[in-house]
Amino acid sequence: MENDKGQLVELYIPRKCSATNRIIKADDHASVQINIAKVDEEGRAIPGEYITYALSGNVRARGESDDSLNRLAQNDGLLKNVWSYSR
């Protein structure tokens, strides 16, 4: 919902799990949101440029967050040649 100035006034903005594409519930206190900064040629972070991944508590509880994060980063071109047990 927006106020008369056009600003968001919602207390909760729903997110989707990047690994499973399911909505993360408001009471999922085990979920995490990870920002990975984009870097320039010198290895310095570019201010304000990052890629965000949200992982639900269910993915973390099953121990699949590491493999999921590697898969997502490979799909976005951040990692190359990462060994995966599922291959």
UniProtKB/Swiss-Prot annotation:
Keywords: Cytoplasm, Ribonucleoprotein, Ribosomal protein, rRNA processing. The keyword Oxidoreductase does not apply. It is found in: Cytoplasm. Coiled coil: none annotated. One of its GO terms (molecular function) is structural constituent of ribosome. One of its GO terms (cellular component) is ribosome. GO terms for biological process: rRNA processing; translation. Required for the processing of the 20S rRNA-precursor to mature 18S rRNA in a late step of the maturation of 40S ribosomal subunits. Has a physiological role leading to 18S rRNA stability. Belongs to the eukaryotic ribosomal protein eS21 family. Component of the small ribosomal subunit. Mature ribosomes consist of a small (40S) and a large (60S) subunit. The 40S subunit contains about 33 different proteins and 1 molecule of RNA (18S). The 60S subunit contains about 49 different proteins and 3 molecules of RNA (25S, 5.8S and 5S). PANTHER family: 40S RIBOSOMAL PROTEIN S21. This is Small ribosomal subunit protein eS21.
